[in-house]
Amino acid sequence: MLEYWGCVHKAAPAYYSYISMLSILCPSFDIVLQILNDQHIQGEYKRIKKIAYNVGETCFSNRIKIGLKQGEHVSGKRVILSVDGGRTRLREMNPHKKPSKSYKAKRAKFDTPWREPKLFVIHVLNKDGSINKHELPIYDAVINDADRCSDLLAGYLKKLRIETAAEILFIADGAEWIWNRAKSTLLKLGVSETKLSEAIDYFHAVEHISDIISTLRKIDKQKKTALVKELKKMLWDGKLEQLISKMTVLSKGRKLILDKLNYFHKNISRMKYDQLRQHNFPCGSGIVESAIRRVINLRFKSPSTFGNHDNVEKLIFLRAIFLAGRWNIMINNLIKLNHKFLQQNLKLVSHLIILN
């Protein structure tokens, strides 16, 4: 019956909410236990982990609706979407790994490879292109799997009725795994192409210009700086054909530079920054880079911090919910979910008793 009152792992909502919150804000579960002890709140290390993972598991299995307000949608709003990848280390079992000679005790052997959490942001813009502070953003991520990331983003957008949005900007860096899926995902959801704008982050494009100019020979540093400034101005003003033509001449047929120029050829339709400014759209993907830093890096990229795939993904999800300002929405939805689940079970039991 404890679940009827919203309990998780025999913990009351206020307790498991606080435990779970500390688990994704603190650098480790040891620090969570230390804080609880300092505040004279009862807690045990194993139980703290179980509660945090249990909350993460329950919310994770209902992740699209658990952090949304009832009836939340983006109808008639200007929406910005952005995707990027971060880095975290995972604990992956390796039974073939040789044990350390300095460590004789028997324990499971594992590797700690770096993996890429792929995170997306959904936010609402004001008419002037600034972020609407009255709307809560949506952050979520999956580890490694680009298709899962795309499917998850599509799930959120479908729930938000993205096809009814007034305008949509999809902005990111030049990673092919992003752009291979971006437009097709939105079109499948019924989004009109006339509403959709795609853009490469301006500052990533500038980095590619700088990389190309840095490889030029027999040009001094001062002239290279002037060239970068000139080409940046062309890029900003939307003079892309002039920019590509100028860099092609500078390359003098060198294959290395011509290969780098393919970046601009492939993304020329996504670099119309003059048109973006006319429509009051941002030209940078700072919202997702900020989210990567706050959601992933500050908690899951620390030295010697690694866990198994499933647990890390659950904690990333909980941290994303908290940093999006949706924690209380999630907890209230979780209580209702537990209540509804138990009610359904009680009805089933009552029905079976009547039949017997």
Briefly describe each language-model feature range.
Residues 1-356:
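Catalytic center-proximal scaffold of phosphoryl-transfer enzymes
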